[in-house]
């Protein structure tokens, strides 16, 4: 069986990652994938470049308001940051392109519990403040409870169950 991925009425499964980004889809992979030898600011600039859109001057300030640690560490190499800080940087990099959809793959992986809760809270705030849709794949039930407005169980690429939030 084969399906397709449709975004705003168009199939996107054959598009390259940078073309998807230019359509307004931001992707934060499992394991974060920051550029370890580049500074926080350089990593954030990559997000703007990938999106193909010039970010307004206040975009950086907005990201720093959601993730203050990035402002404090703006000149630090990303590879020397903790896992939670790198996750915040990866999300910030995606936000530089002002996506309408953010895909997060296992955002809690390898991150201490208090930072997981901070990231969950910030993602909910981002959704409310900017209207960005956040779709995430996650096994951490606490993060799911904190972030989800809908939940689906998948097995081998198929949705097997839809759960109401009171049953999570």
Question: Where do the PLM segments sit?
Answer:
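ABC-type ATPase nucleotide-binding domains, specifically the catalytic core motifs of the NBD
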Residues: 14-17, 40-58, 66-71, 75, ...
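Conserved ABC ATPase signature
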Residues: 77-81
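ABC ATPase C-loop
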Residues: 94-95
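Catalytic Walker B motif of ABC-type/P-loop ATPase nucleotide-binding domains
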Residues: 102-106
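Helical segment within the ABC ATPase nucleotide-binding domain
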Residues: 117-130
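H-loop/switch region of ABC-family ATPase nucleotide-binding domains
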Residues: 138-139
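Conserved small/polar residues in nucleotide/adenosyl-binding loops
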Residues: 166-168
């Amino acid at each position: 069986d084969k399906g397709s991925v449709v975004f705003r009425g168009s199939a996107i499964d054959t598009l390259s990652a940078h073309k998807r980004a230019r359509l307004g889809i931001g992707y934060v992979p499992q394991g974060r994938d920051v550029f370890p030898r580049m500074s926080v600011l350089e990593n954030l600039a990559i997000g703007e470049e990938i999106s193909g859109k010039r970010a307004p001057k206040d975009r950086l300030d907005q990201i720093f308001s959601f993730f203050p640690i990035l402002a404090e560490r703006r000149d630090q190499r990303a590879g020397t940051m903790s896992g939670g800080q790198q996750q915040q940087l990866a999300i910030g990099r995606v936000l530089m392109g002002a996506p309408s959809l953010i895909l997060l793959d296992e955002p809690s992986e390898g991150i201490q519990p208090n930072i997981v809760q901070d990231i969950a809270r910030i993602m909910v705030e981002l959704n409310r403040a900017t209207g960005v849709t956040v779709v995430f794949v996650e096994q951490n039930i606490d993060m799911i409870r904190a972030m989800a407005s809908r939940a689906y169980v998948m097995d081998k690429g198929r949705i097997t169950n839809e759960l109401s939030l009171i049953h999570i």
